[in-house]
Swiss-Prot record:
Organism field: Cupriavidus metallidurans (strain ATCC 43123 / DSM 2839 / NBRC 102507 / CH34)
Species classification: Bacteria, Pseudomonadati, Pseudomonadota, Betaproteobacteria, Burkholderiales
Domain EngA-type G per the UniProt entry, residue ranges: 3-167, 181-354
Protein name per UniProt: GTPase Der
GO BP: ribosome biogenesis
Binding site for GTP 1: 9-16, 56-60, 119-122
InterPro entries the UniProt entry points to: AAA+_ATPase (IPR003593), G_ENGA (IPR031166), GTP-bd (IPR006073), GTPase_Der (IPR016484), KH_dom-like (IPR032859), KH_dom-like_a/b (IPR015946), P-loop_NTPase (IPR027417), Small_GTP-bd (IPR005225)
Function recorded in the entry: GTPase that plays an essential role in the late steps of ribosome biogenesis.
Molecular function per GO: ATP hydrolysis activity; GTP binding; ribosome binding
Annotated residues for binding of GTP 2: 187-194, 234-238, 299-302
Length: 447
């Protein structure tokens, strides 16, 4: 699971700039979702081989009781609840403000691990810039510049260390083993995630366990189908009530991101009786960016007539065209129709994501693709694609070597992707293609 870091502070201290630097983006991967306030943003970042989730909040005024300021305070409190570590950002140029004291008092009462970061500290002596802020009682502050990046890596590294100290299970990375393929069923509220979970587990003996901690922790449900073990990762807020699991349907961005990262295969569940929303597309985008294997389930199919079904299929092609690599299943979790086929696609998607491809076969497919259609010339030169090999799995990565590869167009990249997908039957997994230009060993030789 990925550690969660929340950025908290009064308005205009540089939280959004720090957020963008941590996610290496001007527009976070996880942007605003419809139904969530614009003042709580989620993004994914990575320091070395350490991935994490970061939450940017609006300017925080804990004592606000009405209007937009109160709503921003509510959103910030929720971010603190979801976080493993809180970075409390203050402004080194303006110095300590009364509002900083109020925020510090609030954060102390939450019991969260808090790191104090003094932003805009570039060109300033640490001792002088830090002196004002010791009275907050937050320990030694970190001096950083979110604009220039000074001190940011050290700050995030320390935050991740604290997160693992707080929850050691964050350091564990588990692949499909004795518990089988891990499946995350994700989607917006009320699309039928909990019904699908109960349909999948049926009347079998179920081992359900709540990982220790708060509501941000996932529930894992183990079951068997056809003699194969599987583990479901809950994102619907399932809680056991006797022998059944009841849903507390509350959409959580953190839970969704955590479960996608933890899963081997993601099932994106849509509601056939509702239009595909921007939120559906955002969730689909999370999955593709994460590189996870994917199966799409369109639920409540039994309630539609022929005309309505045609409209839904057209909507899928138009709004979720970027998911064309995934199998789509039209199911009814309530009536238990189409579930077996969906689960078979889960197995196929996992197999495709973990496939090992021999270099000679990859190179042969590349050569056949180039022979059928060469890349376009760029100026006087044409990209030369010479050989290819596999560069990784989950998702599969194919590395193409050659010369002048910066001239390969996006359209030609998609053409190659389709050729590789067809040749190796890579259905259900993203496929990434990387180009590496060969070095000319004689380029630097002297006559």
């Amino acid at each position: 699971m990925k550690p969660v870091i929340a950025l908290v502070g009064r308005p205009n201290v540089g939280k959004s700039t720090l957020f963008n630097r941590m996610t290496r983006s001007r527009d976070a991967l996880v942007a605003d979702l419809p139904g969530l306030t614009r003042d709580r943003h989620y993004g994914e970042g990575r320091i070395g081989d350490r991935p994490f989730i970061v939450i940017d909040t609006g300017g925080f005024e804990p004592v606000a009781k009405e209007g937009i300021v109160a709503e921003m305070a509510k959103q910030t409190r929720q971010a603190v609840v979801e976080a493993d570590v809180v970075i409390f950002l203050v402004d080194g140029r303006l110095g300590l403000a009364p509002q900083d004291r109020v925020i510090a008092d609030y954060l102390r009462k939450t019991g969260r691990r808090v790191m104090l970061a003094i932003n805009k500290a570039e060109g300033m002596k640490y001792t002088s810039v830090a002196a004002d802020f010791y009275e907050l009682g937050m320990g030694d502050p970190y001096a950083i510049s979110s604009t220039h990046g000074d001190g940011v890596r050290e700050l995030v590294d320390e935050a991740l260390d604290l997160a693992v100290q707080e929850r050691p299970e964050l350091a564990d990375q588990e692949d499909a083993g004795q518990h089988g393929v891990k499946i995350a069923i994700v989607g917006r509220p009320n699309v039928g995630k909990s019904t699908l979970v109960n349909t999948l587990i049926g009347e079998e003996r179920v081992i359900a366990f709540d990982m220790p901690g708060t509501t941000r922790d996932a529930i894992y449900v183990e079951f068997e189908r056809g003699g194969k073990p599987y583990t479901l990762i809950d994102t619907a807020g399932l809680r056991k009530r006797g022998k059944v699991f009841e849903a507390i349907e509350k959409f959580s961005v953190v839970k969704t991101l955590q479960s996608i990262a933890d899963a081997n295969v993601v099932v994106l569940l849509l509601d056939a009786q509702q239009d595909i929303s921007e939120q559906d597309a955002h969730i689909a985008g999370f999955i593709v960016e994460s590189g996870r294997a994917l199966v799409v389930g369109v639920n409540k199919w039994d309630g539609l007539d022929g005309h309505q079904r045609d409209r839904v299929k057209h909507d899928l092609e138009r709004k979720l065209q970027f998911l064309s690599f995934a199998n789509i299943h039209f199911v009814s979790a309530r009536e238990r129709t189409g579930i077996g086929a969906l689960l078979r696609s889960v197995d196929d998607a996992y197999a495709a994501a973990m496939i090992k491809l021999p270099t000679p076969q990859i190179t042969r497919v590349l050569q056949e693709a180039v022979e059928f259609q060469q890349p376009k010339r760029v100026g006087v030169s044409r990209p030369k694609l010479r050989y290819a090999h596999q560069g990784g799995s989950n998702p599969p990565i194919i590395v193409v070597h050659g010369n002048a590869l910066s001239g390969v167009t996006d359209a030609y990249r998609r053409y190659l992707e389709n050729r590789f997908r067809t040749a190796f039957k890579l259905k259900g997994t993203p496929l990434r293609i990387e180009f590496r230009t060969n070095k000319n060993p004689y380029a630097e030789s002297k006559d």
